[in-house]
């Protein structure tokens, strides 16, 4: 059996410059907020995701797609550049309490064999981390996910995202990110996708210290995501995180959020978003070169 490794989703430099288009109801809300006619149809999301894959995958080492809105269409339309690997989201988002993702389970409809036949090289699992929920349940889900990936020769990517506790109102996001890393940073996955400390804001030295604390608890390669980080701050966030030990990024919003809802999205993705992704890829290569 052909077993993929993280080297199959990196750039030649060994760094990760990966694009996410697997947002689901959150993307629908972004279109609605941008003034798209309500209700925002599934086809609006699918078209945007497929167009993003076509326009941006030549500049990404991998692209993360979701089963619900674009995996089949991306495969059928050969939307992903040959130089770019495909990652498929293996998480099912369960809405509740007024938010689009209140809990997450492994998507039982996932077919790893088919994904591999379609050119997929990795799966991704979102793990919601709350201090007052059962750690063992999270660890068991990650273990099952890792086995699902590795038994089919696919790379396992976990994405712990912290949330306020179900009960009580005390929430220290920064400490929660560290606590999640302590719990899941040595869980047997191949790659850890993490929220940027301090939302990428503040003095560089503070960001670096926070990123180094994170690095101390993650015993596998790690990359940052861009949700909640101002897109103008994201290039710096990549530099700082990589100085601390990260190996790149897996991000969507910092690349394409600014064109959601604009006309001519194929053109916008090519003219506005592709240069951003190219620049981020250059930063990853530059930071990896410093390690040699």
Curated annotation (Swiss-Prot):
User: Tell me, what's a Pfam family for it?
Assistant: DeoC
Q: Which UniProt keywords apply?
A: Carbohydrate metabolism, Lyase, Schiff base
- Please, which domain of life does this record's source organism belong to? Bacteria
The broad enzyme category this protein falls into is lyase
- A GO molecular-function descriptor: 6-deoxy-6-sulfofructose-1-phosphate aldolase activity
Q: Which reaction does it catalyse?
A: 6-deoxy-6-sulfo-D-fructose 1-phosphate = (2S)-3-sulfolactaldehyde + dihydroxyacetone phosphate
Query: Biological process (GO) annotations?
Result: 6-sulfoquinovose(1-) catabolic process
**Enzyme nomenclature, EC number:** 4.1.2.57
| Signal peptide start-end | none
**Catalytic residues per the record?**
193 (schiff-base intermediate with substrate)
What family does this chain come from, according to its entry? Answer: Belongs to the aldolase LacD family.
- Assembly and interaction partners: Homotetramer.
Q: What does this protein do?
A: Cleaves 6-deoxy-6-sulfo-D-fructose 1-phosphate (SFP) to form dihydroxyacetone phosphate (DHAP) and 3-sulfolactaldehyde (SLA).
Q: What is this protein called?
A: Sulfofructosephosphate aldolase
The protein's gene is named yihT
